[in-house]
Amino acid sequence: MEQNLTTERSETSSSRAGTASRTDKKVFVKTYGCQMNVYDSQRMADALAAEGYRATDVIEDADLVLLNTCHIREKAAEKVYSELGRIRVLKEERAKQGRETVVGVAGCVAQAEGREILRRAPAVDLVIGPQTYHRLPSVVTRARAGEKIVETEYAVEDKFDHLPAPERTAVRSRGVTAFLTVQEGCDKFCTFCVVPYTRGAEVSRPVAQIVAEAERLAEAGVRELTLLGQNVNAWHGEGPDGREWGLGRLLFRLAEIPGLDRLRYTTSHPRDMDEELIAAHRDLIKLMPYLHLPVQAGSDRILKAMNRKHTAADYLRLIERIRAARPDIAMSGDFIVGFPGETDRDFEDTMRIVRDVNYAQAFSFKYSPRPGTPGADMHDQVPDAVKDERLQRLQALLAEQQRAFGESLVGTEIDLLLEKPGRQAGQLVGRSPWLQPVIVEENAGQIGDIVRVRITSSGGHSLFCEPAGTARVAL
């Protein structure tokens, strides 16, 4: 499984608009981890909105509290249990006031821990895995009746067939960019990764279902759509003709939807990057010139131990083909340092591949054994002090590459989608085609506009710019 870790370090509470009246029940959703969890939280909120639940950002006001959890990083479960301890106190205080609070744990920690959550955190009323969110309203109803529920079996039915479509007002409240999950699960079984055990086998949504959801999003004002999957380029969904489509063909179809001006996808596995998908990067102006393509390590010996089933040379040849098709593309990746058995020479191979690719940005982590994965049982675990030193060196190199990429854009003109107000008064923030935050004065246009700007400076992870033209309605 490949996981885009852009939001891995953040935890956000999800505010979802609904159509229920002010007197109806309220739900608070806290989201941990990746973009797919953000999408899942939105869909859970949509399902609950259909049952009269209105979203709130204030946990003290909530009748239902849901933690949508991530299990990728070390101690993920302990972080959840700590949060549940705080929620237990809140639940007890509300009970003294005669106010009922239902507490639920969803996501990958729920799938991995199951009934153990109820044992360790008695304040929890329901535990629900990622494949059964469509059952959430009925599960909540049962929990309100006093039942303790663990719903982590893989559903026979497809949850996407049963989840209600979000209300137009809810979509509008989420902004002009959106996520859309097209693929779930993983069949790769990398030895460091827990996802095949928490998300299950690879499943691809059919074309008609994806297109219908994308059209609804576009009609509600979404201008940039990011397709999500644990291995999104492994997507092979049923087309309208009953035949199997690949991700490249799907992108060509989505590019036909009026109002959708920008397309992205994440996260990909090198083994599933086929010619049709590379052609989409070459031919589709709506497909942004940015690709997150993790390699994890630069040593063939470590790649084999990780069960990646490709070599460093395979990866570099693939990068060459992609760049030949789309010369302006910026590459991103993931790296794990300190995998069991990693030697100094293996680590230098990783540093070499980073220099060879020259990433616009990338994410790097110390290896942490995940219970139940083959890597956790391997010998030659690398000492933490060695991991720390290697990670520091790798991150310094990646930071320098990111800084150089940002500075290379100074003086150029780009099309910028204005997404939201900036942190400072009088500013707006958008995203460059290469995914960097770009800050501009608010007189550049309205949120949802695509404007021509000139990059004036680069600082940290962000770019600064000035207007260079007028707002455009569509590409």
From Swiss-Prot:
Residue ranges constituting the MTTase N-terminal domain according to the UniProt record: 25-145
CDD domains with a match to the protein in the record: Radical_SAM (cd01335)
Cofactor, how bound (note): Binds 2 [4Fe-4S] clusters. One cluster is coordinated with 3 cysteines and an exchangeable S-adenosyl-L-methionine.
Protein name in UniProt: tRNA-2-methylthio-N(6)-dimethylallyladenosine synthase
Single GO MF descriptor: 4 iron, 4 sulfur cluster binding
EC number, as in UniProt: 2.8.4.3
Family affiliation: Belongs to the methylthiotransferase family. MiaB subfamily.
Keyword Glycoprotein in record: no
Functional summary from the UniProt entry: Catalyzes the methylthiolation of N6-(dimethylallyl)adenosine (i(6)A), leading to the formation of 2-methylthio-N6-(dimethylallyl)adenosine (ms(2)i(6)A) at position 37 in tRNAs that read codons beginning with uridine.
Signal peptide: none
Domain Radical SAM core as annotated: residue spans: 172-404
Domain TRAM: 407-469
Phosphoprotein in keyword set: no
This protein's UniProt keywords: 4Fe-4S, Cytoplasm, Iron, Iron-sulfur, Metal-binding, S-adenosyl-L-methionine, Transferase, tRNA processing
Location of the protein in the cell: Cytoplasm
UniProt: [4Fe-4S] cluster 1 binding residues: 34, 70, 108
Cofactor list: [4Fe-4S] cluster
HAMAP family, sorted: tRNA_metthiotr_MiaB (MF_01864)
Natural source organism: Chelativorans sp. (strain BNC1)
Listed InterPro entries: Elp3/MiaA/NifB-like_rSAM, Methylthiotransferase, Methylthiotransferase_CS, Methylthiotransferase_N, Methylthiotransferase_N_sf, MiaB_methiolase, rSAM, rSAM_horseshoe
SUBUNIT field: Monomer.
Catalytic activity: N(6)-dimethylallyladenosine(37) in tRNA + (sulfur carrier)-SH + AH2 + 2 S-adenosyl-L-methionine = 2-methylsulfanyl-N(6)-dimethylallyladenosine(37) in tRNA + (sulfur carrier)-H + 5'-deoxyadenosine + L-methionine + A + S-adenosyl-L-homocysteine + 2 H(+)
Top-level lineage group: Bacteria
Gene this chain is encoded by: miaB
Region: Disordered, residue numbers: 1-20
Binding annotation for [4Fe-4S] cluster 2: 186, 190, 193
Gene Ontology CC terms, in alphabetical order: cytosol
